[in-house]
Amino acid sequence: MVGPDGMLPLPWLEATLRDTLLTRRAHALLLQGPRGVGQFDLAVTLAQAWLCEAASDAARPCGHCASCRLVLARSHPDLMVLLPEALREPLGWNLSDGDEAATDKASKAKPSKEIRVEAVRAAVSFAQVTSARGRCKVVVVHPAERMNDIAANTLLKTLEEPPGQARFVLACSEPEALLATIRSRCQAVPMRLPPAELATEWLTQRGLAEPAVLLAATGGQPQEVLDWVAQGLDAVLWQRIPALVRDGDHGPLTQMQLPRVVDALQKLCHDAACVAAGAAPRYFPAAAVPAGVDLLALVEWSRELDRAARHADHTWNAGLMVEALVLRGQRALTGAGVNAARSANPSGRAMRQGASVNSGP
């Protein structure tokens, strides 16, 4: 959102914001691009621009009119933001009426990662009511791929026959997970990774040490860097991961959440394969990635990591799974060979036990 100083919090969004406001006139937009580049920030800023009472000639929000202040305070009566319950607190948005209804039904369960149908129904009703401040009504959906099938079909009906004054902004990082019919009703706005220099400068301004290392760790996604750091990752630990795996030391990795550990190991596996093929690594410094890996063992490790990724959100036996994955990675990175990996019964049992626990009864 544009603040009273007229500045965007994510500077790399400036050109996309300007282009979208000047050229995209559809009632529904689909912001799509890699995670961590600011889809949600752009979606809310577009809503702010459409609701602004003193927009510039380029339709940019002023940041200081009454409507802009209401958007900044997350209390504009003509703006509804649909988020999974699990993202409400991290992003600082209160529950909508639909979210409250859904939450009352499952108050004892952990926060949902889905956008529920109750929230979408509330948004549909909201869009059909006359604007309170005379501009338009705006519904933001993020991440749009988190709508379950019922919720998505409920929204589709409104996108096909939109109320005259309503506009919709769907933000996502996995557009292929959306219904094809929803994608066809929206005008696409592609978003790309920001220039590394700009993203590194932005991270430096937030006090991060060695931001270039952390930016590479996330594949160039600056907002993902902040999430990783909040969960205990720093540049020193990241650069140690190849050596930790090579030495079979999983202990320091336990300070990271399991999905992050699996993701880090997948990136190490990718980079090890690149180095073995004579290409440059993408995620880790070249000097940190071991050479002389066993390619067959690396393939088996990659398959184990893919299986682990499907269960990474579960907490059962997380420590055992991390240990087993690191041991399998050690054999791949040290060139011990596939046969040695298969003959190592302790890690094999650990992986089977972890898979058995995660698969449920």
Language-model regions: role of each:
Residues 149-152, 334:
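Short N-terminal helix/helix-N-cap motif within the alpha/beta-hydrolase-1
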Residues 133-138, 163-169:
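Loop/turn-to-beta-strand initiation segments
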Residues 146-147, 161, 177:
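Residues immediately C-terminal
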Residues 1-52, 59, 164-167, 172-361:
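Charged, glycine-rich active-site and insertion segments that engage polyanionic ligands
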